[in-house]
Amino acid sequence: MKVRASVKPRCEYCRVIKRKGVLRVICSRQPKHKQRQG
């Protein structure tokens, strides 16, 4: 999980979702693409 100021989808399988007020990127194909805004 990477913590970034700016989260962006890195591939077509990445989804940007908001959980408990925190923006996250989850990816079904590449778990390495997981990000959280912080």
From Swiss-Prot:
It comes from the Bacteria. Belongs to the bacterial ribosomal protein bL36 family. GO terms for molecular function: structural constituent of ribosome. InterPro entries: Ribosomal_bL36, Ribosomal_bL36_sp. PROSITE patterns: RIBOSOMAL_L36. SUPFAM superfamilies: Ribosomal protein L36. Keywords: Ribonucleoprotein, Ribosomal protein. This is Large ribosomal subunit protein bL36. Disulfide bonds: none annotated. One of its GO terms (cellular component) is ribonucleoprotein complex. HAMAP family: Ribosomal_bL36. GO terms for biological process: translation. It holds the Pfam family Ribosomal_L36.
